[in-house]
Regions:
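Active-site helix of classical SDR
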Residues: 114, 118-121
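NAD(P)H-binding glycine-rich loop region in Rossmannoid oxidoreductase-like domains
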Residues: 19-62, 91
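Active-site loop-to-helix junction immediately N-terminal to the catalytic Tyr of the SDR YXXXK motif
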Residues: 108-114, 128, 154
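NAD(P)-dependent short-chain dehydrogenase/reductase
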Residues: 93-101, 124-186
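Adenosine-cofactor binding site in Rossmann-like domains, unifying the SAM/SAH pocket
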Residues: 5-27
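SDR active-site strand-loop-helix element
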Residues: 12, 37-43, 81-87, 139-142
């Protein structure tokens, strides 16, 4: 983004800016005054994590989404939001072949119910804030995300993060095998 002349402001870590807190969210956006905001903020983890922490996952993610849109509205910013909706928002029946026009044609899979549901909520919030307040949003359906800041905790990490971490740890420790959970089926 910097290469095309855009100023990139990376959100600080949660300990210095908690998007679940409205005052923190307003302070961040008031200081940054972004033209575009790529919303990657999420509390998410492995299938076990999102199931065992379903209430926290849906509450904290909904709070972050609402705080971002409310802060933009309250500060009268003309920020355009780019929201990422993970493939877990697709219906359970389409887990093998994703088609963009079918992403809301049924309930999300029970293994990702909390996170998949709140990703759909992201889309609904963006549409409502655009209708009433003119907040422009581009929603992208993404198959997966990986990068700096992701968890490498084996009980919390997504599959790709967990696998990379396990293989690196095994290589570093000279281990001859790596434990991989499950079959890959949802």
């Amino acid at each position: 983004l910097s290469a095309v002349g855009l100023t990139v402001v990376k959100a600080p870590p949660r300990k210095t800016c908690d998007l679940r807190d409205m005052d923190s969210t307003i302070a961040l956006l008031n200081k940054a005054q972004p033209d575009y905001l790529v919303n990657c903020a999420a509390q998410v983890g492995s299938l076990n994590y999102v199931t065992n922490h379903a209430g926290e996952v849906i509450t904290n993610n909904a709070r972050m989404i609402l705080n971002i849109y409310e802060a933009i509205k309250n500060l009268s910013l003309s920020t355009r939001v780019i929201s990422l909706v993970a493939n877990c928002a697709y219906p359970a029946t389409t887990m093998e072949a994703f088609k963009e026009d079918e992403w809301q044609n049924g309930p999300v899979h029970s293994s990702v119910f909390a996170y998949g549901s709140v990703r759909r909520f992201t889309w609904a919030v963006s549409k409502c804030y655009e209708m009433q307040y003119g907040t422009e949003t581009i929603t992208l359906l993404v198959p997966n995300m990986y990068g700096p800041g992701d968890s490498t905790d084996p009980d919390k990490a997504h599959a790709l993060n967990a696998l990379i971490s396990k293989f690196l740890r095994a290589k570093r420790n000279g281990e001859k095998s790596v434990s991989v959970w499950g079959t890959g089926a949802p």
